[in-house]
Amino acid sequence: MRIMVVDDDSERRIILRQSLEQAGHEIVAEVRTAMNLPRLVVELQPDVIIIDTHSPDRDTLEHVVVISQDAPRPIVMFSADNNSEKIREAVRAGVSAYVVDGLAPSRVQPIIDVAIARFEELQALRGELQNAQTELADRKTIERAKGLLMKRKNVDEQEAYRQLRKMAMDENLKLIQVAEEIIRAAKILL
């Protein structure tokens, strides 16, 4: 697994590097700050990002947000800060696993595994949400097109839907595509 490490403490970075290498991981980058993190993530394409910090600062969390939006991947944060608000901020920013007190070499791999599992679950939920939102928007568009057909052709809802389906089949298009065309045509005519 390709891992990027962000840690301003050279001693901890060495411990982390040794733990990761012993587990068979490739360290693609070791950086002291999160300053250029979004750019480096795009360039180096790590599978996982590990951030070791005394306490996550605003800049680090903002960079995590950018990564989570533009190039999502599991992010593990080791920190000495056990403030519950800081933990919530980090998780909201996109941290998959926030670990307080303990960069023990034996714990690194299980923590990475948890972060990956949590990240994959969250990505699946986001995908489901996106699909549901798209489906709802499509239904609204189809209903609107149906309403236009009902009004224009003076037919009932069932007949308008049948005509929409027939147009889609005749043109070898999806129902939503036909509905969008009807709405566009209606805008032009009005």
Language-model-derived ranges and their functions:
Residues G127-L190:
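C-terminal output/effector regions of signal-responsive regulators
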Residues T33-L37, D47-I67:
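Conserved phosphotransfer microenvironments
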Residues R73-N82:
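A short, hydrophobic beta-strand element within the central beta-sheet of small alpha/beta folds
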Residues G24-T33:
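Short hydrophobic/Thr-rich beta-strand motif most characteristic of the beta2 strand and flanking loop
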Residues M1-E11, L16-L20, I49:
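Conserved acidic segment of CheY-like receiver
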Residues E85, L103-I112:
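C-terminal output helix
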